[in-house]
Curated annotation (Swiss-Prot):
Residues 169-256 form the PPIase FKBP-type domain. It comes from the Bacteria. Its main location: cytoplasm. This is Trigger factor. Keywords: Cell cycle, Cell division, Chaperone, Cytoplasm, Isomerase, Rotamase. Involved in protein export. Acts as a chaperone by maintaining the newly synthesized protein in an open conformation. Functions as a peptidyl-prolyl cis-trans isomerase. GO terms for biological process: 'de novo' cotranslational protein folding; cell division; chaperone-mediated protein folding; protein transport; protein unfolding. Disulfide bonds: none annotated.
């Protein structure tokens, strides 16, 4: 079988295949024999009907079309193997099947054109001496105070409030029922009993918590409110509503004292001073990690700007599918029903967002891999083995050795490539908030699902 290749756009390899007459005949005869062997024709036992009757019963043109389809499929697989083409998939016939069927005569040669996706060629521009600017994430002592305050909030207990009206910061226990102002119909999910809400701005739709402030326990009121125009549940966006609210109880947070006893209760440290020292070191390490992440993102962005690659559709589609599944799992872990995001109406926009993210991720990955090949950057297996041991100590679930090895190898190789690029680039560290020129700044990780909604139509903001 004669095969000639030609490069096509989008990292496709064009194949011009010439099939010998004997092979075109074999494809047809094999199909006829197989059909005769399994044919069930009235008046004949399976496989006993004569050839002409089988051809007449199933239709000569139908059998010829099926034989051609089989011939094309087997010839393409043979051509890819014969030419040692690293196919990614997405085999496509470039000729019209109907036109080929008109030319196909069993026993006569047949030529056709096809295409297959292959690994893209990555062309690196100037990847040494990149000029990179990125911002520092500073450590601030206030972060430790904020974290300790969060711990106090988590250990806070609610105690009853008596003899005064509701104030900002109280936790109110209320009954409420919402109706639409226009027709008086109940708002689905807009009713609750013994509902606890902290009286802080922004906890519910504008005006709800504010309307409770000043109420006495046992009082009732009616709040005339409006759902925001960008409310997640579209049927309520911009809708005027009335909420009948009854204040049943008031509570206030009682925070634990910040002392050595508190430190011992929430950690392995015996003193508050030791806990503070640990948190300070932790915050400093996190700030350094974020600063490095900014550096890495800026390097990658500059590298991609110097890289040319024509992405094949197969790789893009695989990456889109991976991102979609990842987003689906992330939403579930956040307690959000993915079907509320991946709706039929939203899917075109979601797919477009995923596609852009997928192409960017692929370009980054391919560019880094090309640098590794060009500079012979590798990770020693001893290093991978040591990293696997570390990962196992951090993981709670059982993960296969192969999966851990692949993850560790990829993680460590990426780190080595970025360190090499950093050593061979001109890097400028900017102050927090200082403007960074387009093209040299940091890329935030792509987020797919935005505007996640609560399952109930309660007056949440």
């Amino acid at each position: 079988m004669k095969v000639t290749q030609e490069k096509l756009p989008r990292s496709q390899m064009g194949l011009n295949v010439e099939v010998e007459g004997e092979k075109s005949k074999q494809a047809y005869e094999k199909l006829v024999r197989d059909t005769m062997r399994t044919a069930r024709i009235p008046g004949f036992r399976p496989g006993k009907a004569p050839r002409q009757l089988v051809l007449q019963f199933y239709g000569k043109e139908r059998l010829r079309a099926q034989a051609l389809e089989n011939l094309i499929d087997s010839s393409l697989k043979e051509a890819i193997e014969q030419e040692s083409i690293a196919s990614l998939g997405n085999l496509q016939l470039r000729d019209s099947f109907e036109e080929l069927l008109g030319r196909y005569q069993p026993g006569e040669p047949l030529s056709f054109k096809a295409a297959v996706d292959v690994q893209p060629e990555v062309q690196l521009g100037t990847y040494t001496g990149l000029t990179v600017r990125y911002s520092e994430v500073p450590y601030e002592a206030k972060q430790v105070d904020d974290q300790l305050e969060q711990y106090r909030e988590q250990r806070a207990v609610l105690v009853p409030v008596e003899g005064r009206a509701a104030e900002v910061g109280d936790t109110a226990v209320i009954d409420f029922a919402g109706t639409k102002a226009a027709d008086g119909n109940e708002i689905v999910g807009g009713k609750a009993t013994d509902f606890e809400v902290e009286l802080l701005p922004g906890r519910l739709i504008a005006g709800f918590t504010e309307g409770i402030i000043g109420m006495q326990i046992g009082e009732s009121t009616e709040l005339a409110l409006r759902f925001p125009d960008d409310y997640p549940q579209q049927e309520l966006a911009g809708v005027d509503a009335k909420f009948a609210v009854s204040l049943k109880d008031l509570k206030i947070k009682e925070l634990p004292v910040l002392d050595d006893d508190f430190a011992g209760d929430i950690s392995e440290f015996e003193t508050l001073e030791a806990l503070r020292a640990f948190l300070e070191q932790q915050q400093q390490e996190q700030a350094a990690e974020k600063t490095r992440a900014n550096r890495d993102a800026a390097i990658i962005k500059a590298l991609v700007a110097e890289t040319t690659v024509d992405l094949p559709e197969t790789l893009v589609n695989r990456e889109v599918q991976f991102l979609a599944e990842q987003s689906f799992r992330n939403l579930q872990q956040q307690g959000i029903d993915p079907s509320r995001i991946f709706t039929e109406e939203n899917m075109p926009r979601v797919r477009e967002t995923l596609r852009v993210d997928a192409e960017n991720r692929l370009k980054r990955t391919l560019a880094l891999a090309q640098v590794a090949r060009a500079e012979n950057i590798v990770v020693e297996e001893e290093q991978v083995a040591a990293r696997i041991v570390e990962l196992r100590s951090e993981l709670e679930e059982e993960v296969s050795e192969q999966a851990l090895a692949e993850f560790a190898r990829e993680e460590m190789l990426t780190e080595k490539i970025l360190e090499w690029l950093a050593e061979h680039s001109t890097i400028e560290l900017t102050l927090p908030g200082e403007a960074i020129e387009p093209g040299s700044g940091e890329d935030a990780p792509p987020e797919v699902a935005a505007g996640a909604t609560e399952p109930e139509a309660q007056p949440n903001s």
